[in-house]
């Protein structure tokens, strides 16, 4: 790998868009140059890939390779839990809901989960049948809404959150396991961004750990976009008896603190 005399080579590592990281201890990384679009490398960021090609020299600290073949070995992570709610597509289609975040459209249709029925089952019940549990204030369960395969929580004066289903198989005493999810706050007609303060709560019996999610900090008029929240599980037990709640600190207040959430995952990177 460090030789300057290699000809036709094969290298395996994590692809980040233009380079391969072979291992944390490797002296050099590998830059993939002149790769034809037919190899599909642009779609493999974050994957472990095996690249075969011609050695094209060293430009310290980067070895260069002209790729002729690429093998995708999957994402560079072990996934213990994943939920993207794509299975809600039948309810999304039935209700004609929109995509507020992706289109930055405050008028995109959002329908209460309790009001959308497919085959006799509401979207609200379909989610809870998978082990989730919604929480909401004022005894009003109509304030969790469906967008196109993701969820919107709250309206002015009403607030909500979600408890994850039981999750098993997450290793203890690991420093690099994380819980992550995509979220976005709602923008008001005036341009003000709803001041949402999200928290993640882990409960194991009487033990309770609360993690604050950084605020968006957006200026008025900011375009809506997904933000990735990550919570380290270092020192936190997660098993089938753990209650994990993603919610907001604002509760029983009359303000607008609306938010969207998608793509919940518990994972750890694979060490090469």
State each model region's role.
Residues 74-126:
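Extracellular carbohydrate-recognition regions
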Residues 202, 207-272:
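Terminal, low-complexity interaction segments
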Residues 1-76:
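OB-fold and OB-like single-stranded nucleic-acid-recognition modules
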Residues 13-15, 85, 164-188:
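Extra-cytoplasmic beta-strand recognition segments
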Residues 193-204:
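Short, surface-exposed beta-strand/strand-loop-strand elements in extracellular ectodomains
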Residues 47-49, 177, 240-244:
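Exposed beta-strand face motif in extracellular beta-rich ectodomains
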Residues 149-178, 228-230, 261:
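Short beta-strands within extracellular/lumenal beta-sheet-rich domains
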Residues 157, 171-173, 184-195, 252-254:
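Extended, low-complexity, turn-rich repeat/linker tracts enriched in Gly/Pro/Ser/Thr and Asp/Glu
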